[in-house]
């Protein structure tokens, strides 16, 4: 107990080797795993489950009621995985009945200061949200997404793996995997080649993604027809994922269509 401040208010379940600062409030329905650091004046409430080896910085608020007028006190959850860094003044809400009743954050993510994660959001693994990035309800991020600071993302938008969003953008449509988007409203600006070169060992995969991107977004052909054609002819798993993302998009893809 030597790592838990006497000035913390703890009603929930705490794992082994956790360090909890003064003024922290952990309510009765919270479950926290092992080796977590929770800095002073953080509030963790609601039906919140947190894994192992996370660092939650001062004044973060996790699990407070969804900011949704349709929410009327139903039992909904916030689930956070392992090895995440959640910086100062971040706000993360649980889910709502209309969205599966759960907000989920995976492993190895960095949420910088003043980030907001709204109800029913899904964040996968290894994502970075820079300062004051804002995810509205039901947004979904696949692995290795990077979102620049001061960027809001509209409700129900999906952002694909390895995509990067420029700072001070406004994202209103789905952003495919492996791409860069920027602007208000954000549009595709090309491929996230720097990120791909860092993470992909096989150069032929990057070349295949480049070719597919040009066919999809620079050929002037109908987008979904082109995605179907490529999907039927490719064996590359990343190209398949790109095409399937395009075909399954519900909010559309923001790009400048060639004539």
Curated annotation (Swiss-Prot):
Alphabetically ordered keywords of this record: Acyltransferase, Cytoplasm, Lipid A biosynthesis, Lipid biosynthesis, Lipid metabolism, Repeat, Transferase
InterPro entries, A to Z: Acetyltransf_C (IPR029098), Acetyltransf_C_sf (IPR037157), Hexapep (IPR001451), Hexapep_transf_CS (IPR018357), Lipid_A_LpxA (IPR010137), Trimer_LpxA-like_sf (IPR011004)
GO molecular function: acyl-[acyl-carrier-protein]-UDP-N-acetylglucosamine O-acyltransferase activity
Record pathway: Glycolipid biosynthesis; lipid IV(A) biosynthesis; lipid IV(A) from (3R)-3-hydroxytetradecanoyl-[acyl-carrier-protein] and UDP-N-acetyl-alpha-D-glucosamine: step 1/6
Pfam families per the UniProt record, alphabetical: Acetyltransf_11, Hexapep
EC id: 2.3.1.129
Phosphoprotein as UniProt keyword: no
Name of protein: Acyl-[acyl-carrier-protein]--UDP-N-acetylglucosamine O-acyltransferase
Naturally occurring in which organism (per UniProt): Nautilia profundicola (strain ATCC BAA-1463 / DSM 18972 / AmH)
